[in-house]
């Protein structure tokens, strides 16, 4: 969602804050702004749209100051425009904020009764006025922080700057991440280590409920009980270099093409092919005695969890339940004593998933996480962390993070199946050998660029698209539909192929695209019947199958993409690639913003 950066230095902080904002672009945003302290006054520039527009404002009216804050906003309260862009200012007070202040309406009414004039629709402006209210009454920075934290309900990361205190920033976090950076004669605060990496590698993470007073040469942290504490300082492994697109047109294109390599990296972390040995992290329980595993995730990661259910139940004979993170806490699910919960999140900061994790911990579950960012809140609050080696994923729509999640989940399933005595060494080798060959098959699919382009050209004018799959590839159909919606803004729905006759078939008419994910497996003949039904009603079928499946069809669709033959167990990883490619090329045809689709954010840090 929003991105925050703040800095105290002994030279102009504007270039460094701009660099930090650029590195936060991947989170998604619709406006940006910077405020600095200059000779005892606050100076601010804001712009709707991309950071390039903010840079244009800064060229016209430069900023200079040794203390400053910056922000990229993704609208929640108030439309995306300059007026609602952060930082928000009230007199000498400037505030940037990520999250949602749930009681902002009550606070707004109270502040208006005190004479404050509201200029925006945002909840953040309320915070700025609240800080000014306490500042005007002579409270010290420490007392101001205690007072506002007592008044605010909801989730937030806040950085506050007061002109009367040059060289000082105040910050607080509740269910939204903040990191502190230590530089040479400089201090930093930001949403994550990625934003701070160009300036410093020395990072300290605030824990939930922490608040802090930051000066150029000192830092004081208090916990949620207002007790002064220290938080460990570590050297971040995040690169300070700004990640580029290289030879690719978009980050998504680059990340799609990186999948053969990063899946290989992830496999090497969990499996040694020379000894046929699984290298999964040790857990504090016996997988053989585990009564149930609950998998919790959101968006694309939820579909990875659905596929993992097939693997864990089929291979390890382990009861698995898969929950949407935003629903998990609200249905009083049955979590047995000694059970475990696995939380999947690319960023490790998805707030729905984080809150679900805390709920599961309160219910006595062993906590495992599968993340791509090890310096993340979910990772720090887990008992065991499985790390995908996808590298930074910048495009909002997930590609390589998803397929590396699947690779890691299949490794976990094989490992636990072996520990639960349902797989012998020979069967482990068969599955893992097939998985190890997968990068070669993925590279083969990537070589067919021209036909994907041609198919996308024909489908780009569609109003609606249906995706169908069975068994392990039912979630692939769901993921394909999600990718198309995210990137091209075409309405798409994914269904289990066997459900077509139970409603979705009513949508079929002449020319409607139907994407069928149908490797030749035990379910193929039934899926082929669905294909015939779609063709009989004039549907434009796009078939994704292997040579054996294609040869068994009497009626050939207009578009047939022959996929490499793989073991059905690993097919969801392979078949993720064509649905990504189809969505990408259709988005190119439609001219949408592939890397930052409208209204979407990379890291969803509000509920």
Protein language model regions, located:
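Glycine-rich oxoanion-binding loops at beta->alpha junctions
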Residues: 49, 66-83, 269-285, 308-344, ...
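Glycine-rich, anion-gripping cofactor-binding loops and their flanking helix/strand elements
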Residues: 179-201, 326-361, 499-533, 566-580, ...
